[in-house]
């Protein structure tokens, strides 16, 4: 029985008029809809919450369909025979922009949309499939159509944090499709507010707030900027969100092994398949592997290699009744253990067929508290070594996404603004090298460089609060007033079967760590990009909220900071900055660029960077020097 029943092609066209990407040649895109049919009785599928309640076709299978997008070499013989399936992040494609250092666009069609062409020059076939039922089909976002469980009711919990005062808020994360309330007058619905992170929730009297319609709430006086609001209410007819795992798996299965007669545009062209996910979709990958759902209905291990990126130690509401796959709340079912490799990959070990995994994180995943749980025991008292089939890397001194130069004024996803200028370190070259290392590991048996992360044993794993004195000594710096760690949570007796009780019972916080720092305030542990090895600034993975957006002093969830060194020794002595000035480090711009070139070559030799990125790294360092000098001058004037 076929898992993919049909590819409905809407568009198929050659990219850029046939312009070649190096030796790979021209690429084409295929855009369409994939139709699926899954066996609900299959032992693996019984893990999908409520699949037994889903409507079935005459063959007893559950049908669903998702948006499909494919980039492939026109001549498959010129490709590398590798599929990279990029799990969309909240409906958006990410692989081309992060690996190719390109702008993020929904339908890459112009030369600039492919950046440096890395994935294409290396011959990858890149695919996407919509996997979220709650994604609106707007701005090219990709979604999954799944059955709804008609007549099933239950509780939903939504969290919102506005950056400005607003009169109403939707019952969904960001722009996603809400679960509507079943009763506008529901007296059991609850709204709580916390004035800042870590504060005790205060219940808002029911008379002070209301459902303005089935998908929005309103509050007397409006919702305050920076405050954290949670609403718990009843809804009906939940989507079968867990089918997203099967959509991702079966798309790759079909592309790898289905014959040309089935309409497979990649028939016979793919030898290997790799799975990539960033942030929310990185957590999706961890959850998928935890369930062992990288194995298809025929018992084949679909993915040879997996790259969960900036997913931290969490999973998500990806297999929950009334689950919100886009939810980014820390106190969610996605923050339940297990966290480290021993627990997350237990099912893979038992079956004996295991993909190679390279897990990468940036610094904010450590400062929010969950990333260190990947490589400690549950009590945070000892290091837990990664499994032999895993490499774990911290990209030291980075923020959640590659730093832009010049930096953005606000987070492009959330609109959040920081007190400090955002982190400008570009970790994309590290990510490109990680993919090459994964491919060589799978294809040639060449093991990647050893894992690099903060360790208790060597003192590089420290509590975040211990770093406050150093950062506080840097003039003009605002260190977070509160470090909030994830807590032990209890979502009730039915959580194991995918039904959560709200609010959860919260226990003691976990013991978590960040990397220690050097004399410049830059992180010691992890893979250090050239920006840290030849520094012009302190690059942190933390930033605090802009006071104009409320809750000043609260930690931002995804952005770091760039704290430029003083320009001259006189600037350093006048301001009392504990860090050496730029002029004391480098005799000239040329000397600085030579240092960048030297340290980049060392990273290439260690296989942390690729030789093809050397000149691009030096060119960016040239621009970084100019920008940092501008920022150093501005800072010196403001402190004089």
Give the predicted meaning of each segment.
Residues 2-640:
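C-terminal His-loop and adjacent cap/lid subdomain of alpha/beta-hydrolase
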């Amino acid at each position: 029985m076929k898992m993919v029943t049909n590819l409905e092609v809407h568009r198929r066209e050659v990219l850029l008029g046939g312009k070649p990407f190096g030796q790979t040649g021209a690429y084409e895109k295929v855009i369409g809809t994939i139709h699926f049919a899954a066996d609900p009785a299959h032992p693996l599928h019984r893990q999908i919450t409520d699949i037994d309640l889903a409507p079935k076709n005459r063959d007893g299978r559950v049908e669903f369909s998702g948006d499909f997008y494919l980039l492939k070499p026109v001549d498959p013989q010129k490709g590398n025979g590798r599929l990279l399936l990029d799990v969309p992040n909240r409906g958006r494609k990410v692989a081309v922009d992060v690996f190719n250092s390109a702008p993020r666009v929904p339908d890459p069609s112009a030369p600039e949309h492919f950046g440096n062409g890395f994935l294409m020059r290396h011959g990858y076939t890149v695919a996407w499939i919509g996997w979220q039922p709650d994604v609106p089909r707007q701005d090219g976002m990709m979604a999954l159509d799944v059955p709804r469980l008609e007549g099933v009711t239950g509780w939903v919990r939504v969290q919102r944090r506005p950056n400005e005062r607003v009169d109403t808020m939707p019952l969904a994360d960001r722009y996603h499709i809400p679960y509507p309330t079943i009763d506008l007058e529901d007296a059991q619905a609850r709204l709580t507010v916390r004035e800042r992170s870590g504060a005790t929730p205060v219940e808002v009297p029911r008379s002070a707030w209301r459902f303005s319609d089935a998908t929005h709430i309103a509050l007397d006086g409006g919702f305050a900027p920076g405050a954290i609001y949670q609403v718990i209410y009843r809804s009906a007819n939940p989507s079968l969100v867990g089918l997203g795992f099967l959509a991702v798996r079966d798309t790759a299965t079909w592309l790898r092994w289905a014959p040309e007669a089935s309409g497979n545009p990649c028939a016979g062209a793919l030898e290997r398949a790799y799975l990539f996910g960033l942030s929310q979709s990185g957590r999706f990958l961890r959850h998928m592997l935890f369930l062992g759902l990288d194995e298809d209905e025929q018992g084949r291990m679909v993915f040879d290699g997996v790259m969960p990126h900036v997913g931290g130690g969490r999973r998500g509401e990806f297999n929950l009744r009334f689950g919100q796959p886009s939810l980014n709340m820390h106190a969610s079912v996605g923050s339940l253990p297990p966290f480290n490799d021993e627990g997350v990959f237990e099912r893979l070990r038992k079956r004996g067929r295991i993909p190679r995994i390279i897990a990468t994180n940036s610094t904010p995943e450590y400062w929010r508290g969950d990333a260190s749980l990947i490589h400690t025991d549950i009590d945070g008292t000892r290091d837990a070594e990664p499994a032999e089939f895993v490499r774990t890397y911290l990209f030291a001194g980075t923020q959640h996404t590659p730093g832009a130069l010049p930096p953005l004024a606000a987070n492009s996803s959330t609109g959040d603004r920081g007190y400090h200028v955002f982190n400008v370190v570009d970790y994309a070259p590290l990510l490109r090298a990680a993919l090459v290392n994964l491919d060589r590991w799978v294809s040639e048996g060449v093991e990647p460089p050893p894992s690099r992360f903060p360790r208790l044993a060597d003192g590089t794993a420290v509590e975040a609060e211990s770093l406050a004195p150093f950062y506080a000594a840097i003039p003009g710096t605002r260190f977070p007033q509160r470090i909030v760690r994830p807590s032990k949570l209890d979502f009730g007796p039915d959580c194991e079967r995918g039904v959560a009780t709200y609010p959860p019972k919260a226990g003691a916080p976990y013991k978590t760590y960040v990397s220690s720092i050097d004399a410049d305030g830059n992180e010691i542990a992890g893979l250090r990009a050239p920006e840290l090895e030849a520094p012009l600034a302190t690059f942190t993975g933390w930033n605090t909220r802009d006071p104009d957006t409320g809750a000043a002093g609260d930690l931002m969830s995804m952005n770091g900071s760039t704290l430029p060194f003083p320009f001259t020794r006189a600037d350093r002595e006048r301001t009392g900055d504990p860090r050496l000035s730029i002029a004391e480090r480098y005799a000239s711009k040329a000397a600085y660029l030579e240092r960048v070139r030297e340290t980049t070559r060392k990273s290439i030799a260690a296989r942390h960077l690729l030789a093809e990125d050397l000149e691009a790294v030096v060119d960016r360092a040239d621009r970084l020097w100019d920008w940092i000098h501008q920022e150093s001058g501005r800072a010196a004037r403001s402190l004089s």
